[in-house]
From Swiss-Prot:
GO MF: GTP binding; GTPase activity; translation initiation factor activity
The protein's name: Translation initiation factor IF-2
Cited Pfam families: EF-G_D2 (PF22042), GTP_EFTU (PF00009), IF-2 (PF11987), IF2_N (PF04760)
tr-type G domain span: 550-723
Transmembrane segments: none
Amino acid sequence: MTNGKVRIYELSKELNLDNKELLAICDQLSIAVKSHSSTISESEAENIRTAAEKLAATNVSAKKELGTTSHKPNSPPNGGRNRPAAPHKQQILEIRKPKILRNTTSNAPEASVANNTQAALSEANPPSPPRPFATPASPMKPAAPTRPVPRTQSETQEQPPVTDLEQTPNPSQAPEKVASQKPEKVVPPRPKSEKPQKPQLVAPPARPAAEVAQAEVAQVSDEPVSQADKPILKRDQRLRPVEGDREQIKPRVAKLPTDQSPQSAPQRQARPTPAPTRPEQRGNRPSAPSQLGEGQRPRPARPGESVAAAMPIATPPRQMSGIAGKSQGLGDEPVTPDLLDLKRPSPPRPTKGGKKWVEEEIIDEVKEKAKAGVKGKRIKPILDDEFEEDLLDDDDIDSPATVQVSLSIARPPKPKATRPVQMPGASLASAPTARGSRKPGSKSGSNRDHHNNRRQQEADTKRDRPEKVTITGPLTVQELSDVLAVPDTEIVKILFLKGMAVSITQNLDIPTITLVGKELEIEVETVEREAEARKITEMVGAEDQEYLHRRPPVVTIMGHVDHGKTTLLDSIRKTKVAAGEAGGITQHIGAYHVDVVHEGKPQQIVFLDTPGHEAFTAMRARGARVTDIAVLVVAADDGVRPQTIEAISHAQAAGVPIVVAINKIDKEGAQPERVKQELTQYGLTAEDWGGETIMVPVSAIRGENLDTLLEMILLVAEVGELSANPDRTAKGTVIEAHLDKAKGAVATLLIQNGTLHVGDILVAGSAFGKVRAMVDDRGKRVDIASPSFAVEVLGLSDVPAAGDEFEVFQNEKEARSLASDRADRQRLSRLLQGRVTLTTLSAQAQEGELKELNLILKGDVQGSVEAIVGALKQIPQNEVQIRMLLATAGEITETDIDLAAASNAVIIGFNTTFASGARQAADEAGVDVREYNVIYKLLEDIQDALEGLLEPELVEEPLGQTEVRAVFPVGRGAVAGCYVQSGKLVRNCKVRVRRGGKVIYEGVLDSLKRMKEDAREVNAGYECGVGMDKFNDWVEGDIIESYQMVTKRRTLTLTR
């Protein structure tokens, strides 16, 4: 304390109080303080000390009265709060004096469960009025069981003795009240439950002795136990003998129309009434036991249940009204004759005699005779299921229908000619055929045959449909229909119902395919697609092990586009291949030989140069599959790019060692260390960084470090111990293939094992041929091609596919048969892919005119055609589709022109030429022929053509914004005096009037004037008058937004 000032926290220590309590005392004394560190004067501190002492004294006295323990810090505030609590105690004491708890003794155990005595006594206040026994008891009773719901059964069992204690004032009402108060839902049906109680006692004696005992138990616990469980148990026990004793039911049903006395009715009406009563009992289970606790109505419920199900099935629609009336009044007597009418039309079903070929008059007589035995044969319709809608109109067809079942069993071995039009119906009728087969066979044999055929077709489709399919990736709707053996329209329908509108040629992803399979109950298993670069067959077999010799390594140069792969190969070969490539990019696989002197010995390396463009993925994978070593070229100034990553994955999938050539180190922005860092993310760590990957910085243009690169390649080849058997017939892979107008089919073959000679008979894929000539990479003719050499082969009958494996055969007949078998398989698969079915045509007709672009693609080599077709598949084809009529290697011929003219197609030529007379034929037929030598340009033009087929979309283009500053009444309407804030206002443009941020009108600007003269448009910064025919409710401050609708060409985005 200094200068007569005291801090709050010092005072709290002195008084042994909390800061909060001291601040509360300051508030009571109106002493202005902000926090515990505030200072007060000595006089104010003295006042606080006095108040604190008084507060402590009152606190002690309050503790003595209450006898409760509390913490010292909280005592002052609690003491203040306990003062108003005293009157509460007095009220509680006053409540105890009258002791009105006699009627509420049942509540006492529940109330005593509460922990706090004060709360329990306060809860006892409401039961004081329960003497009237009406209003307070009902809120009080349900409140207790709502907490422990499962205890309701035990509580109801404990309650009867309680009610016995309370029965002195009202012996008859007390048990009903206790029972009704527990479940509130039972209260409304009380009047109904009282009526059947009288017949209750009459019915059980008519039943077996076991039922009498159960009925007595039911009577004892009938009124207090109003739950849904016990009456249901009684009902089940009584139902069992009733089901077994069906003969007893039948005569009672017959008595019903005659005996309709109100007292005996409840017991006998139970037979016909189950149809309406059953739904009501099931609908509100809690109330049903109170009504039917006696066991009278539920007793025939089980047999009646099936009768109820059969009644609407076997009767015409008019009987539905009878059922509706029945459901409205449960015990109404006039409804029972309706039920008899309901039963009468159905007996023809049991009258099964051999009368199906008799005329209608005789059938009517049979029906009349059958009416006498309606009740006896009422059980037969139980066989019918709940398919009411299938059999609602089966009045006259019943007797032939039963014989139809036997015919359907006999006929399937003799199917009639199938009708394709009925196929969709077969799939739709899959579920009801077995049950609904009685309905179609009405009067003519043709109907029966039709349905037999339908069932036969359905059985065939079910047999063909697989239970489990395996997919490796996305499929088109058409491909998926082949895999699942269902019509493609069925798949489109399933997806449409799921909210996805798809076309026949649209690609479906794996989750969507799984969804379709789930709907069709076909298990779809997804298997990871095998890497294209994986080596499928081992060229060197066990029989070659004794004759192996060292062979040159096959090295594939891979990497991103424009990273210098071909330039690097040029520098090694001392040639200019890159200059000859169109657009400066490689679009083929090139195979080249390089002679290298290593350790004083001449050695050879075979290089395969692969394209880096993304469209040539298959080519890169093919290169990795046949290679021994992969040289990954990465530009030092560009780093790792998408195709670099893809090349790494191809090489790793093929299991070949990777040598990294970091190119363009002579450029200014070169960062070889950054390239090494990026490559470590893909498992390639440089040797100088402690890894195993050889990385050589090179400059292709200057020729730096090329010798080091070649030396490293030969070292890796030595470690791999590459060998082959040169003394056997040749085996290998087709690197590239094309059709030459002078030479015919030409294929570049890489021999991986054995030796190829001129005159050998070989099969490459589906192409058969005899080697007429071989040319090496420098254009020289050779007679022998040893392992690891790449040569161009002439003499094949057809152009093989790039990536096919070839093999030399000694027997020409064997080779021809193998080639023809493969050709047949390819032709069949091609037909399946390109087929146009009636279902697809009908689907296209439903969608409207389907826009499609017909293309004929001719390329120089098979690999380029494959790459272009793969790239075109990436273009989305939801609204516009590409229809590839022909895609092959070779020059453009007159046959291609004729096909294009007939199908209105565009011919795309890629690095190819015209055959003689083809160009003139194209001009005469008006066929559009486009020639390309760079794949970029080809893909761009095709995408532009597809976008041109799309309907242009209307886009809103804003023109300006105008503010209304004055309103002038003119005649009946009004004119807005406006100021153009931005843009411009154009007459007859579309406008939107906003007021307070909300659009109040949209329309057309009819009148625009400036200085009392009509104006075509008014620019920003000028004033004008605006008038509209349909809008005159102008207010100053309104904003007019002007805009116009313009057509915009739609674009397609390439899917990845």
